[in-house]
Each structure stands twice: as C-alpha cells, then as structure tokens.
Amino acid sequence: MTIMEKETKIRELWISNEEFQALEKCNSETRYTYTVKRIIDTEVLWTIVDEEDHLVIQTDGNKKFLPVWSSKEYAQVFCVKGENNYKYSAITSETFQDSVIDYIKQNGILINVFPTKKEPLGKIVDLKTFVEEINYLAEDYYGEIDYFTL
C-alpha cells in the first residue's frame, strides 16, 4: 500500500533527547500507552515506508506487522542508511481511517506498537484492540466517540 498524504499540516510532537532515551528503556506496555495517547493528541501516527512509499510490513513466521510510533524520532531509528532504504512517514488519523484500516483488515496485519532496535516487536495488538484503545482514551480525555471505526 502506498501512503499518499493530502496536503495537511502535520502536528508533530517534539521529543527531547532525555525523553527519547527514557522512553526507549520503558517496557512495551508503557510505550504502547504513551503512543496511543500521543496519536490522539497529534492526530498522527508514524511508520516506515520503502523507497516507493509502500508501507513496510514486518514479518515473523507467518505473522505480519505494521510498525507504528508516536513521533518521527522513534520511527527514524529504523531508517538506517546502508541497512535499508526505508524512510519514516506520517499517517494522519484521516488517512489511517480512510485507507490503512482496510489494508490492515484485508491483509491480516497486526499492529506492532513502538518497536525499538533492542525490542523489534513492541506491543503486538490486533486492529480491533488498537482501535478500541484509541477510542476509549479519546472518549475519556476529549469526549470524542469513535475516533476510528472498523
């Protein structure tokens, strides 16, 4: 799947070096909760794409994963020159809803939330769980119901 964003202003989250390093050391559950909250705050999630802007899908045996992060700094770690031709890419909540959700459902892809170089499989959740968590927190924090729909 190719990510083609509309011309929109991406609300980026600025990450200090201290925050970056501290969060990378947290367990996958803490990183997951942090990521979900930041996706709601910024209405953006970050992933990696190849040189043709196709989503990079990780595999482990017969399982497929879409890696997602809360900010480009974390996604950028997976885009090492010479190691691969990946680049980080923002996905707005609108694009995620309109295009990516269907792609994930059609291809049986799980969500790999906030993997790190040390822990390439972060918290693995299915799409339904991911959407339910985001909707629950969005309603709790902002009174928004159905931030995403399946």
Please provide the spans of the model-predicted regions.
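Conserved NAD+-utilizing ADP-ribose enzyme module
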Residues: 2-150
